[in-house]
Amino acid sequence: MTGFSVYLGQPLDEAYIKRMIKQGYQMIFTSVQIPEEDDETKYHYFTKLLNLLKHEQVTYLIDANPSILTPSFYDHLRQYDAQFMIRIDHSTSIEAIEAIMAQGLKCCLNASIISRELLTSLHQQLNDFTLLSFCHNYYPRPDTGLSVDLVNKKNELIYQFNPKAQIYGFIVGSDLRGPLHKGLPTIEATRHSHPVVAAKLLQETGVSEVLVGDSLIEMRQAKQLIDFCKHRHFTLCIEEVFDTTVTYLFDMCHKVRPDNPENVIRSETSRQICPHSIQPQFTTQRRIGSVTVDNLNNGRYQGEMQIVRQTLSAHDNVNVVAQIIKEDLPLLSCIEPNDTFDFQKTRECKK
């Protein structure tokens, strides 16, 4: 499940929220315990959010202190046909967890500070430990985000107690939330990363569910992120195609070969549909992000499309037919065997 964040101390960006749900995002993270937010204001906008999406299938992950989980709070949630998960940041106890579960709600614990002692105690005392999920912190202040190693160790610890646990982690968005405006990542190394690169690193540590921490992510990146998380699919933006005789290759979906090499991304499907001889032209140096097609000099490889990941010298048998834009170059390191990809022209990417 991939999610985004909505903060309640300011008017809702309803158009953005609806676009994200339409894109396929199914979870919303929000908090009712941010100190600088007025209580009356945040509960007003929380109600507006619930009403806005009352006909959508959405799971809400609500960051809350057990002290504010009153009967009236639970009664308010029951008015809506939605899934609610309460994240306890601190003050974790068996009693607090059981009180949440007794209301028919799921409970989420702070994965960043979880300990073996707490997990052991919960595993022994809870009726159904598998109902717990876990969510890491985000870190607004630069240089305070977690290391890859620490996140990996915390996740490994959780999986020892429940191999199928849901573990959430945060990545940075586009409109960086105040007051620091430095991004809200779980892992410090991803503070300035493309969202897909950040999501991939989280997944490699064992995080199963990715959340955008900041209050907004640009729509094209939002689409790239959901496509990656749900389908392992990549849409790459290119400058105009240099060779119009191979435009058919840019109107189709490609699958990466299962034995894909290190320096290039090979399309498994491109050679199968080569409709004509491809003459040698544009046989220039292959830069990172160059899209190439083998010409007739390469015999049975004629028509094979590749995307270059490391700078390669010019070759008489290889035509350079397009170039991926700078903003999408980080995605090349994320593409793996059996993934799929397609292309958009620059003018289409800006729509």
From Swiss-Prot:
Its EC number is 3.2.1.-. It holds the Pfam family MupG_C. Keywords: Cytoplasm, Glycosidase, Hydrolase. Pathway: Cell wall biogenesis; peptidoglycan recycling. Disruption phenotype: Cells lacking this gene show a cytoplasmic accumulation of MurNAc 6-phosphate-GlcNAc, predominantly during stationary phase. This accumulation can be abolished by expressing MupG. GO terms for molecular function: hydrolase activity, acting on glycosyl bonds. One of its GO terms (biological process) is peptidoglycan turnover. The keyword Cytoplasm applies. The keyword Transport does not apply. InterPro entries: Aldolase_TIM, Cyclophilin-like_dom_sf, Glycoside_hydrolase_SF, MupG, MupG_C, MupG_N. Its main location: cytoplasm. Transmembrane segments: none annotated. It is found in: Cytoplasm. It is an enzyme of class 3 (hydrolase). GO terms for cellular component: cytoplasm. It catalyses: 6-phospho-N-acetyl-beta-D-muramate-(1->4)-N-acetyl-D-glucosamine + H2O = N-acetyl-D-muramate 6-phosphate + N-acetyl-D-glucosamine. It comes from the Bacteria. Belongs to the glycosyl hydrolase 170 family. Involved in the recycling pathway of the cell wall turnover product MurNAc-GlcNAc in S.aureus. Catalyzes the hydrolysis of MurNAc 6-phosphate-GlcNAc, the disaccharide product of MurP-uptake and phosphorylation, yielding MurNAc 6-phosphate and GlcNAc. This is 6-phospho-N-acetylmuramidase. It comes from Staphylococcus aureus (strain USA300). The gene is mupG.
